[in-house]
Amino acid sequence: MTDIRKSHPLAKIINESFIDLPAPSNISAWWNFGSLLGVCLIIQILTGLFLAMHYTSDTMTAFSSVTHICRDVNYGWIIRYMHANGASMFFICLFMHAGRGVYYGSYTFTETWNIGILLMFTVMATAFMGYVLPWGQMSFWGATVITNLLSAIPYIGTNLVEWIWGGFSVDKATLTRLFAFHFILPFIISALAAVHLLFLHETGSNNPSGMMSDSDKIPFHPYYTIKDILGILLLILVLMLLVLFSPDLLGDPDNYIPANPLNTPPHIKPEWYFLFAYAILRSIPNKLGGVLALVLSILILAIIPFLHTSKQRSMMFRPLSQCLFWLLVADLLTLTWIGGQPVEHPFITIGQLASILYFSIFLILMPVSGIIENRLLKW
């Protein structure tokens, strides 16, 4: 008799995805981040659901409802801070996961890669909307500044912004609709993640060497389930250390001041995970140019597969490309730092140079290094 996990229609899907899935025998800890992102999403949906039970999306009561959650709701403070810091963990895992894809050439699975980029945009949109909900100073002004960027679109820009706002400024209508979208988007992310996995399982996983591993596969369970559980335990450990010891470490103190349209904070800046894109936006003096650069800073990932010139897939045996990859990491850290600094000398110049370098690495230096490495290996 066939095992029920192989014959039952639902169990069969789970079996083929997480139990009997043939996986390369040499995938490293860098392949843990996919499952960690799944865990982050589950944590965010669960904590978010309990927060939504007590939150009110009205400009008069939003701020005090968040205060009420932290002070009066049983364990409300831990749910709130797990949700806020869970977003930071989500983005750390997301950047590591995407970085792994760039380093090991996983972008050659174009369908999986493109859905991954779509997921990244969706997660960023969800996080932005979530940041607006507590209705503190940074929530209000962040919402005003970021939605206002759409006014740079020719002809329809102003109408589009007012349509999104539901009026002539960020107000009650804006907050209500952002809460509605913030609630629904994680479920859309879940569906996209399922499609992401579907396409991945069509091709099978990549591995550090970048070579075909069909002749050397092992079952996902127990080898990688146990490895994933270790990763999950470490993720929860780091998250809980953050939540229990310094929950406001990554937040902005200005968000503890209720939103006031008449008083602009001295430095308007988004959460840390958007600072690199924010720095690129600010480095271009033209409004439309800045918005385009902002979108392209993520969208550039979609053209990486077309700029792959090396005959090898992974960077594992390509020292020149490795140097460029770590230069890119350093550049992203520099941009993150600049995004949090005021717009003054020397930060403006550093931001502009870092932005030029960011696009140059992807568009010029990496394709050229691939060609040079091919020549060095007489290919």
Swiss-Prot record:
One of its GO terms (molecular function) is ubiquinol-cytochrome-c reductase activity. Heme b b562 binds at residues 83, 182. A ubiquinone binds at residue 201. Its main location: mitochondrion. One of its GO terms (cellular component) is mitochondrial inner membrane. Heme b b566 binds at residues 97, 196. The keyword Transmembrane applies. One of its GO terms (biological process) is mitochondrial electron transport, ubiquinol to cytochrome c. It holds the Pfam family Cytochrome_B. It is found in: Mitochondrion inner membrane. Belongs to the cytochrome b family. Heme 1 (or BL or b562) is low-potential and absorbs at about 562 nm, and heme 2 (or BH or b566) is high-potential and absorbs at about 566 nm. This is Cytochrome b. The gene is MT-CYB.
